[in-house]
Regions:
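Nucleotidyltransferase catalytic core that binds NTPs
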Residues: 1-114
Length: 114
């Protein structure tokens, strides 16, 4: 729920964005919402290996196409695990995440006493 709220606030200025949650398969969500394609960002070749397999399964199982976008080089190393670890040890992640996420990470670190 916290992630949903942060994403909603971060994208509030974008009129064509809808933030939603789904507990099943992404292709089932797509079918339920008349979505014909998925756009995924790729950070590295390792992402591509997995995502290509998933795209092929999704296409075969449901007809939903997947398109890939390369991540900007400045962000290609980022992962939620890395950002959380940096924040946990007091690192500055303000240039890596939206302001609201940075504030939430700082609050979580303060609560944990680190």
């Amino acid at each position: 729920q916290e992630r949903m709220e942060m994403i909603t606030k971060t994208t509030a200025h974008l009129p064509n964005i809808r933030v939603d949650s789904w507990s099943g398969l992404l292709v089932d969500y797509c079918k339920s919402n008349d979505i014909q394609s998925i756009v995924k960002g790729l950070r590295a070749v390792t992402d591509f290996d997995y995502e290509l397999q998933m795209a092929q399964v999704n296409l075969q199982a449901s007809g939903v196409e997947t398109m890939f976008m390369a991540t900007a080089p400045a962000h290609s190393f980022l992962s939620s695990s890395l950002v959380k670890e940096l924040a946990h040890y007091g690192g500055d992640v303000s240039s890596m995440v939206p302001k609201i996420v940075n504030e939430a990470l700082k609050a979580r670190v303060a609560e944990s006493g680190n």
